[in-house]
Design a protein with these regions (language model features):
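Glycine-rich loop at the start of a catalytic domain that most often binds anionic cofactors/ligands
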Residues: 40
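Extended compositionally biased segments used for macromolecular assembly or nucleic-acid engagement
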Residues: 32-36
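Charged, amphipathic alpha-helical segments and their flanking helix caps
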Residues: 1-28, 43-144
């Protein structure tokens, strides 16, 4: 399992999404019709290394939500959803409840950087983007 897949699985635990089919957060792109969700890597790098050699990364991901955005009520409801998702992620951070990563990787922190309307199609579907930031530790393998 990849780090991306682990984060997708973790986000599927948020009960505010209308996943159709259930348990489906796609990679990189949403489906053509709302509601649809996807997750895409957005960069990061090695931030620090501790004295024993453990590495700490900041990895960013774009969570996309394709929702109906044809009128003011739809858009207001969509921002309620985004605020609720951000609040849920903050709660997970406060509780130390993080995605289970493969191998020697573990999550040290999770945060939402921003949430915004990214694009609106001619059919009135809005593509919303939430930037999620993970602080990841890669544990060093002891010699011997």
């Amino acid at each position: 399992m990849s780090i991306l897949q682990a984060l997708q699985d973790f986000l599927e635990g948020y009960e505010g999404m209308e996943l159709r089919p259930p348990g489906e957060i796609l990679t990189d792109l949403t489906r053509a019709a709302p509601p649809s969700y996807s997750l895409a890597p957005a960069g990061g790098g090695t931030d620090t290394q501790d004295v024993v050699g453990n590495r700490y990364y900041t990895s960013r991901y774009h969570f996309f939500a394709l929702e109906c955005a044809g009128d003011e009520a739809d858009r207001a409801e969509n921002y309620d959803f985004l605020e609720s998702l951000a609040s849920w992620l903050e709660d997970q951070e406060d509780q130390g409840n993080y995605p289970e990563l493969p191998g020697r990787y573990s999550v040290e922190g999770i945060a939402v950087q921003y949430a915004t309307l990214y694009d609106v199609s001619q059919n009135g579907a809005g593509l919303y983007q939430v930037q999620i930031e993970l602080t990841i530790k890669k544990e060093v393998v002891p010699n011997g």
